[in-house]
């Protein structure tokens, strides 16, 4: 491939991972965004989307030279919107160049004409002229600072240069220095991603105006929302150390992730064990975001789809761990988690010093503590990271990740957690995440049983179940979970999104957790009995909402 000469401001076609080439513009990255090591790359903002990324130079092509070629191979609606945004940007930039020189000439003529008409002939006229000149100077100073964000006539020139070439605008305070006129281009993009690639998330700030919005993004956002552009403020991720009332210290972090955006994947080799409802979605998102992944499952056929998508196949858990830097596992219960680590050709046989193991299974604190001890005893690093969510959230990369254990490993998993989830929390020492996950699922399982109980009570008392749902959706209990589960029940759709047998398992473990500290859990205990009845009715492999059937049989 012949070397391509590219520079700042060039329009390009950029290819990111498995996504098709997309039109973008080479721009300066934000100051706090480090350039990835390795091959030469440019920071590109993509037209028609809210994404930006570091793109390797070999994945970039000049826009105009390859325009026809790219349009032929991509016919999608969003792609066409992106191309339209490029053309609009070019049209506006061209119009700006033409009007800029015309305006400069008109300004000069107006100034000359004004001088001829304003020659002073008396003392009063001299005083008027003096006042007028003072106002003109003040306004000219303000014109350099005031660059309107709502203007549709923007080009590629800097704010300072545009202000010098255009006539003075509205009155205001003069600039203190030229630094006020230098606005990072990155402040114009809405909803940007967080993490190693983007390192921050853009959010609107109502108190500040947009100082200099990039025209093509301004055009796209207006065309989609029909609202004026607003300013976006960089918010860096923070780890917050919270001192609890008990005196113990827990480290918590809420890290926003790159939902539907671009992520710079870690250069570490990733392994993944367990391709069930949750694991399948997680692996799919890891691959989409460019991670190198080796997979294994007890059912070998489950690996085939991911091999086609670019994953590598591991023959045993031990082989996966020995060939990868960080290995994740997501299995059904404590017994499966132990067998995976301690069984024949298990994880423990592949552990070497500095090898990393992340258990994403929902298990009890004793189990995860035991696994951590045997991994660390071999020189490995351990992190527990159970996930809150369901199959759909897993597929969408919108899980909530609860992590505890090796803090450094948690940070090393950053790009992986961003690919698979919307938020991650670091909860301190091993066992904390397991306890928190069981409590979360205890609340969810109990709520689901209450929903089913309410729907059946409405039915037997002659009330409309749909009307009950409508009322609940208009009140304080309204949620996606409530609406989806009720709709599925009313439609008789119990396709598993979260297996009933697993929520019952989590209720059982949560009750045991309460017993261990002499804390009563009567609501969870009652819900657990209803789920046990549903299991007796052969509902184990249906969705948790099938607990409804325990009330009607």
From Swiss-Prot:
It comes from Pongo abelii. Coiled coil: none annotated. Cytokine-like nuclear factor with chromatin gene reader activity involved in chromatin modification and regulation of gene expression. Acts as a nucleosome-destabilizing factor that is recruited to genes during transcriptional activation. Recognizes and binds histone H3 without a preference for specific epigenetic markers and also binds DNA. Interacts with KDM1B and promotes its histone demethylase activity by facilitating the capture of H3 tails, they form a multifunctional enzyme complex that modifies transcribed chromatin and facilitates Pol II transcription through nucleosomes. This is Cytokine-like nuclear factor N-PAC. The keyword Metal-binding does not apply. Residues 8-66 form the PWWP domain. The record marks 217 as: Required to promote KDM1B demethylase activity toward histone H3K4me1 and H3K4me2. Residues 216-225 are annotated as: Interaction with KDM1B. It is found in: Nucleus; Chromosome. It comes from the Eukaryota. It holds the Pfam family NAD_binding_11. The modification Phosphoserine is found at residues 130, 167, 540. One of its GO terms (molecular function) is nucleosome binding. Residues 92-188 are annotated as: Disordered. Residues 214-217 are annotated as: Interaction with histone H3. There is a cross-link at residues 135, 176, 179, 201, 211, 227, 237, 240, 269, 302 (Glycyl lysine isopeptide (Lys-Gly) (interchain with G-Cter in SUMO2)). One of its GO terms (biological process) is transcription elongation-coupled chromatin remodeling. The keyword Transmembrane does not apply.
């Amino acid at each position: 491939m012949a070397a391509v000469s590219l520079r700042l401001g060039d329009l390009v076609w950029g290819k990111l991972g498995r996504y098709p080439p997309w039109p973008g513009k080479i721009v300066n990255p934000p100051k706090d965004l480090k350039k990835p090591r390795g091959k030469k790359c440019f920071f590109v903002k993509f037209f028609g989307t809210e994404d930006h990324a570091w793109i390797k130079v070999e994945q970039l092509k000049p826009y105009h030279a390859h325009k026809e070629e790219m349009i032929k191979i991509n016919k999608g609606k969003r792609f066409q919107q992106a191309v339209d945004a490029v053309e609009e940007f070019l049209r506006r930039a061209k119009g700006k160049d033409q009007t800029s020189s015309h305006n400069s000439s008109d300004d000069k003529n107006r100034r000359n004409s004004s001088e001829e008409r304003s020659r002073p002939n008396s003392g009063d006229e001299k005083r008027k002229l003096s006042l007028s000149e003072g106002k003109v100077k003040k306004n000219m100073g303000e014109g350099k600072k005031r660059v309107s964000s709502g203007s549709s006539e923007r080009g590629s020139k800097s704010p300072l240069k545009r202000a010098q070439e255009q006539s003075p605008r509205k009155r205001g305070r003069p600039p203190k220095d030229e630094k006020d006129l230098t606005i990072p281009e990155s402040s114009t993009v809405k909803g940007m991603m967080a993490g190693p690639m983007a390192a921050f998330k853009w959010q609107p700030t109502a108190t500040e105006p947009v100082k200099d919005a990039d025209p093509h993004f301004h055009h796209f956002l207006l065309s989609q929302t029909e609202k004026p552009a607003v300013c976006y403020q960089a918010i860096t991720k923070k780890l917050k150390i919270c001192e609890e009332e008990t005196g113990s210290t827990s480290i918590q972090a809420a890290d926003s992730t790159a939902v539907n955006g671009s992520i710079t994947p870690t250069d570490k080799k990733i392994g993944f064990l367990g391709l069930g409802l949750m694991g399948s979605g997680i692996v799919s998102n890891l691959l989409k975001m460019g991670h190198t992944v080796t997979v294994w499952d007890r059912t070998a056929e489950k690996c085939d789809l991911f091999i086609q998508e670019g994953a590598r196949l591991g023959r045993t858990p031990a082989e996966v761990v020995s060939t990868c830097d960080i290995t994740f596992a997501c299995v059904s219960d404590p017994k499966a988690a132990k067998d995976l680590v301690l069984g024949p050709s298990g994880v423990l046989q592949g552990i070497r010093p500095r090898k990393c193991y992340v258990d994403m299974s929902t298990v009890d604190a004793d189990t995860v503590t035991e696994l951590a001890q045997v991994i660390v005893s071999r020189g490995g690093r351990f992190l527990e990271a159970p996930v809150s969510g369901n199959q759909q959230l897993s597929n969408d990369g919108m899980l909530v990740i609860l992590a505890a254990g090796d803090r450094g490993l948690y940070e090393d998993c950053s790009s992986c957690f961003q690919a698979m989830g919307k938020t991650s929390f670091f909860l301190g020492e091993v066992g904390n995440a397991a306890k928190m996950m069981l409590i979360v699922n205890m609340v969810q399982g109990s709520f689901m049983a209450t929903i089913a109980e309410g729907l059946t009570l409405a039915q037997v008392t002659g009330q409309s179940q749909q009307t009950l749902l409508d009322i609940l959706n208009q009140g304080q209990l309204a949620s996606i979970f409530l609406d989806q589960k009720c709709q599925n029940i009313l439609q008789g759709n119990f396709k598993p999104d979260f297996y009933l047998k697993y929520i019952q398992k989590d209720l059982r473990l949560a009750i045991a957790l309460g017993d261990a500290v002499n804390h009563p859990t009567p609501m969870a205990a009652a819900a657990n009995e209803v789920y046990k009845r549903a299991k007796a009715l052969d509902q184990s492999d249906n969705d948790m909402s099938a607990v409804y059937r325990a009330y009607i049989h």
